[in-house]
Amino acid sequence: MEGVLYKWTNYLSGWQPRWFLLCGGILSYYDSPEDAWKGCKGSIQMAVCEIQVHSVDNTRMDLIIPGEQYFYLKARSVAERQRWLVALGSAKACLTDSRTQKEKEFAENTENLKTKMSELRLYCDLLVQQVDKTKEVATAGVADSEEGIDVGTLLRSTCNTFLKTLEECMQIANAAFTSELLYHTPPGSPQLAVLKSSKMKHPIIPIHNSLERPIELNSCENGSLSVEVNGDEELLMKTKKSSLYLKSTKADCNISSEENTDGNTTVQGERMKEDGEENLESHDRDLAQPGSDSVCSPESPWEDSEEVIPTFFSTMNTSFSDIELLEDSGIPTEAFLASCYAVVPVLDKLGPTVFAPVKMDLVGNIKKVNQKYITNKEEFTTLQKIVLHEVEADVARVRNSATEALLWLKRGLKFLKGFLTEVKNGEKDIQTALNNAYGKTLRQHHGWVVRGVFALALRAAPSYEDFVAALTIKEGDHQKEAFSAGMQRDLSLYLPAMEKQLAILDTLYEIHGLESDEVV
């Protein structure tokens, strides 16, 4: 069902007309049918919300998820409200049965997982005891060789049982916590990181124009975070940025490009003025003056350059390299969270099932910080303001606080940065790259059970060729030589920006003593 309903927005704007769409058990809303291509402004799951009819206003109905979401709606007439109530109630009833079955299966799997975890702890204790016994036998010498053989056999048997139980834990976890639970995009909404594949061409454009169109981050009226951007425009924008790093093959025609903080581009020729900032036309005239060893036409950087192949990192909706720090190195909250969302799909390319726990942890922490942000967007414009607010309120160390969520979020981002750095530096073994990154970042914060789960996940890591192929926008691009150069170029932009912002957060947490040695 679809149609126009009035939604209460705030005390300033009051009731505003919105176009609602009920499909697949999800009620989503848009500014208008014509703006549906931009993606929904908000949505609510009918299976988990309460439908309340207003006691006085016979055109009003409220959809509520206690403590999370509140949709206050009004129809244009009593009859229209009745039609919506029937449709919403039917959708909720149809979903309840299947939801109950899924919850039952989820509970059973959770209980089985707890049982297996208890067995793991038991086997761990046995391993410790048997290792101590082995040490004693080894220290005593080889007087009784049979006893040494028996101890070794018993230790091997316990190790095999431990590994088998750990694998069963992973199988149960994979069955119960699939990656499909992480994102539920409302019908009609564009996917976050899906771009149309098209052959890249070099556009002839005025280079003095701004190369970056601001990405509009629309925080939904009900608190969800979404990114709105036109796919073709965004791909074109990223292509322009990438093209600035091409070099002309003509002799003595080296033209370098770099982005200013305001998004404009400065082109440097051989005869640049000392201030280094002139427009393209003046440089072309300088390069063409008599006395130069060679003459380049303005079009030469485009005509003679090699093919530019877009990668996952050059076509991200929002990137850490796009973020401009505010006053006192303030990290803008909305842009940072959107950049975090944009990098999460890297885990899907490593393995959507085995890395689901890591992905769920990252997404969960992003949502916790966002929930704090939307409570007061005017005040919490930077991450530092959120942390300092909780420090002053003495809730920074409270479990599930935004400060704690940001702590684990930056740890997860450090792991991803470490892994991508290994790949950029030429590591061809994905398992080795992951293991090195894990050892430098997350391992010290994990107990033996989580370390074992990660070790098991490493065994399912893809090959280098498969991982690189997953980072392409157009199938088969990874086989081209220009793709490797493109990856190096994009990561050289992306990783330093990411590292700079993580370093700022590290300093903030160190100053206020917010780092934790807690092991999970």
Swiss-Prot record:
<feature type="modified residue" description="Phosphothreonine">
    <location>
        <position position="153"/>
    </location>
</feature>
<dbReference type="InterPro" id="IPR036497">
    <property type="entry name" value="GLTP_sf"/>
</dbReference>
<comment type="subunit">
    <text>Homodimer. Interacts with ARF1; the interaction together with phosphatidylinositol 4-phosphate binding is required for FAPP2 GlcCer transfer ability.</text>
</comment>
<dbReference type="GO" id="GO:0042802">
    <property type="term" value="F:identical protein binding"/>
</dbReference>
<keyword id="KW-0597">Phosphoprotein</keyword>
<dbReference type="GO" id="GO:0070273">
    <property type="term" value="F:phosphatidylinositol-4-phosphate binding"/>
</dbReference>
<dbReference type="Pfam" id="PF00169">
    <property type="entry name" value="PH"/>
</dbReference>
<keyword id="KW-0333">Golgi apparatus</keyword>
<comment type="function">
    <text>Cargo transport protein that is required for apical transport from the trans-Golgi network (TGN). Transports AQP2 from the trans-Golgi network (TGN) to sites of AQP2 phosphorylation. Mediates the non-vesicular transport of glucosylceramide (GlcCer) from the trans-Golgi network (TGN) to the plasma membrane and plays a pivotal role in the synthesis of complex glycosphingolipids. Binding of both phosphatidylinositol 4-phosphate (PIP) and ARF1 are essential for the GlcCer transfer ability.</text>
</comment>
<protein>
    <recommendedName>
        <fullName>Pleckstrin homology domain-containing family A member 8</fullName>
    </recommendedName>
</protein>
<dbReference type="GO" id="GO:1902388">
    <property type="term" value="F:ceramide 1-phosphate transfer activity"/>
</dbReference>
<keyword id="KW-0445">Lipid transport</keyword>
<dbReference type="GO" id="GO:0035627">
    <property type="term" value="P:ceramide transport"/>
</dbReference>
<dbReference type="GO" id="GO:0097001">
    <property type="term" value="F:ceramide binding"/>
</dbReference>
<dbReference type="InterPro" id="IPR014830">
    <property type="entry name" value="Glycolipid_transfer_prot_dom"/>
</dbReference>
<dbReference type="GO" id="GO:0051861">
    <property type="term" value="F:glycolipid binding"/>
</dbReference>
<feature type="modified residue" description="Phosphoserine">
    <location>
        <position position="145"/>
    </location>
</feature>
<keyword id="KW-0446">Lipid-binding</keyword>
<feature type="domain" description="PH">
    <location>
        <begin position="1"/>
        <end position="93"/>
    </location>
</feature>
<dbReference type="GO" id="GO:0016020">
    <property type="term" value="C:membrane"/>
</dbReference>
<dbReference type="GO" id="GO:0017089">
    <property type="term" value="F:glycolipid transfer activity"/>
</dbReference>
<dbReference type="GO" id="GO:0005829">
    <property type="term" value="C:cytosol"/>
</dbReference>
<feature type="compositionally biased region" description="Basic and acidic residues">
    <location>
        <begin position="270"/>
        <end position="287"/>
    </location>
</feature>
<dbReference type="GO" id="GO:1902387">
    <property type="term" value="F:ceramide 1-phosphate binding"/>
</dbReference>
<dbReference type="InterPro" id="IPR001849">
    <property type="entry name" value="PH_domain"/>
</dbReference>
<dbReference type="GO" id="GO:0120009">
    <property type="term" value="P:intermembrane lipid transfer"/>
</dbReference>
<feature type="region of interest" description="Glycolipid transfer protein homology domain">
    <location>
        <begin position="311"/>
        <end position="520"/>
    </location>
</feature>
<dbReference type="GO" id="GO:0015031">
    <property type="term" value="P:protein transport"/>
</dbReference>
<keyword id="KW-0813">Transport</keyword>
<dbReference type="GO" id="GO:0005654">
    <property type="term" value="C:nucleoplasm"/>
</dbReference>
<dbReference type="GO" id="GO:0006869">
    <property type="term" value="P:lipid transport"/>
</dbReference>
<keyword id="KW-0653">Protein transport</keyword>
<feature type="compositionally biased region" description="Polar residues">
    <location>
        <begin position="255"/>
        <end position="268"/>
    </location>
</feature>
<dbReference type="Pfam" id="PF08718">
    <property type="entry name" value="GLTP"/>
</dbReference>
<dbReference type="InterPro" id="IPR011993">
    <property type="entry name" value="PH-like_dom_sf"/>
</dbReference>
<dbReference type="GO" id="GO:0035621">
    <property type="term" value="P:ER to Golgi ceramide transport"/>
</dbReference>
<dbReference type="GO" id="GO:0005802">
    <property type="term" value="C:trans-Golgi network"/>
</dbReference>
<feature type="region of interest" description="Disordered">
    <location>
        <begin position="255"/>
        <end position="303"/>
    </location>
</feature>
<keyword id="KW-0472">Membrane</keyword>
<feature type="modified residue" description="Phosphothreonine">
    <location>
        <position position="139"/>
    </location>
</feature>
